[in-house]
Regions:
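Short amphipathic, positively biased membrane-proximal segments
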Residues: 1-164
Length: 164
């Protein structure tokens, strides 16, 4: 099922989701370092990465939602997409709560904000796997006729032409 939200010939959600995943993963690393070293700069960087990751997730989400709307009802892909999307809302909520709890004292990393970030990170691993299942196993966002010799997505040529 081909994506309905493309950027330079590729599914927009797939391109954009790399930013929040990277930023939120980096945030957990900085948060861990802040707890271990008690260095305020580490906590401040974790807070900044968390905020940027949340914003990135808010940008990527509409692209995935738009594609999800085109998945046929009653399919396994539609159900997995629903769980994937709602799970990612929870991921952003957990990181958002962590960010809100820390905002008043950016240089301090507390136990509850850290636990929320780690829980969000763990849930993102599950929802990321579900996203991969949708693409790799169920073909969501994959061009119709995709094949090993398909022309570049920037060529303007359909993938099916090279499938002969």
């Amino acid at each position: 099922m081909e994506s309905h939200s493309k950027i330079f010939g590729h599914p927009g959600h797939t391109l954009l989701i790399t930013f929040p995943l990277g930023l939120l993963s980096t945030a957990v690393i900085f948060d861990t370092l802040a707890l271990l070293t008690h260095k305020p700069k580490m906590a401040e960087q974790g807070l900044a990465m968390t905020g940027a990751g949340i914003l990135g997730g808010l940008v990527a989400a509409p692209f995935g939602t738009w594609d999800w709307l085109f998945i046929p009802k009653g399919t396994r892909a539609k159900n997995i997409g629903r769980v994937h999307g709602l799970g990612n809302v929870a991921v952003l909520g957990l990181f958002g709560a962590s960010w809100a709890l820390r905002r008043s004292d950016p240089g301090k990393m507390g136990g509850l904000p850290f636990a929320l970030s780690v829980l969000g990170f763990s849930l993102a691993g599950l929802t990321g796997w579900l996203g991969g299942e949708m693409v790799d196993r169920l073909g969501v966002g994959v061009d119709d006729g995709a094949n090993l010799d398909a022309p570049s997505s920037l060529s303007g040529l359909p993938t099916a032409e090279s499938a002969e």
